[in-house]
Amino acid sequence: MFCEFAIIGTTASGKSALALQIAQEFSGVILSLDSLALYKQIDIASAKPSRKELASVKHFGVDEIYPNENFSVGMFFKIYERAKDYALNADCPLIITGGSGFYLRSMLSGLAPDVPKCDKALSNDEIYALAARIDPEFCAKFSPNDSYRLEKWYQIYKFSGAVPSTWLRENTSEPVIKELAIFEILWSAQAIRERIQRRTQAMFEAGLLEEAKFLFDTYGRELKPLRSIGLKECADFFDAKISREELASLICTHTAQLAKRQRTFNRSQFSKIFIGEPDAAREKIKGFLKNQAKRP
């Protein structure tokens, strides 16, 4: 029975493990939303599923390209279409999971055209004041402290000369997914910190430093995926800028900061069917799939 749904959550929340369990039990396939797992050879730093796990369940969005190859959201849409076609032909569930909420939001809301960056001649307060005058729709959705959104709004305004909210409606492509059940795994901040610490230690034991050295020796250090959390700190360690203890601490700190940003993004961008810890989410998803199986 084909259906599609998403399991989201912060980094180290256990969403990939839950997706794997559900896929094994219901003969499903997985589409990864992880922006680092896309890359071949970045296995430990991306917390990619093991080779055994990848062999047990068909995955899309994992090991798609090499670190020195370009990637875009449009390319991700094509991977989604491949995954959906496969699941339709196999008549099985498609489980979408990972931490890159931007990919998921783009599939649900459509993809806006790229807008060139411009010099930000105004402060955030000045941009927000301008938006309040000409684009109250934007101000109703976003905080005056949201620097990223304010900069994007200003870029669109300078590029188009139009009201950004109106311009986006007129120029954004149609969503590739019209409706999607979304389940979010949520832990307390303390629980996530502890999970991050355990995962970071496991990454070192699995050979994170050796993987980082191989990647830097092969590709240099300037490629975007090689400046991700877990790798950028290794570069500082190799340069003797930080100690081994500081290396682990910084990776944990930066990962926890990422988790906080992901939680904020998920809360503001998606309507969920369920929010809770993995065991409760598992039961909700099983109920959802059983209901899907009953549909004519």
From Swiss-Prot:
Site positions for Interaction with substrate tRNA: S100
SUPFAM superfamilies in the record: P-loop containing nucleoside triphosphate hydrolases
Binding site for substrate: T11, A12, S13, G14, K15, S16
Binding residues for ATP: G9, T10, T11, A12, S13, G14, K15, S16
Example of a GO MF term: tRNA dimethylallyltransferase activity
Key words of the record: ATP-binding, Magnesium, Nucleotide-binding, Transferase, tRNA processing
InterPro entries xrefs: Dimethylallyltransferase, IPT, P-loop_NTPase
Example of a GO biological process term: tRNA modification
Functional summary from the UniProt entry: Catalyzes the transfer of a dimethylallyl group onto the adenine at position 37 in tRNAs that read codons beginning with uridine, leading to the formation of N6-(dimethylallyl)adenosine (i(6)A).
Protein name, per record: tRNA dimethylallyltransferase
Organism: Campylobacter curvus (strain 525.92)
Lineage of source species: Bacteria, Pseudomonadati, Campylobacterota, Epsilonproteobacteria, Campylobacterales
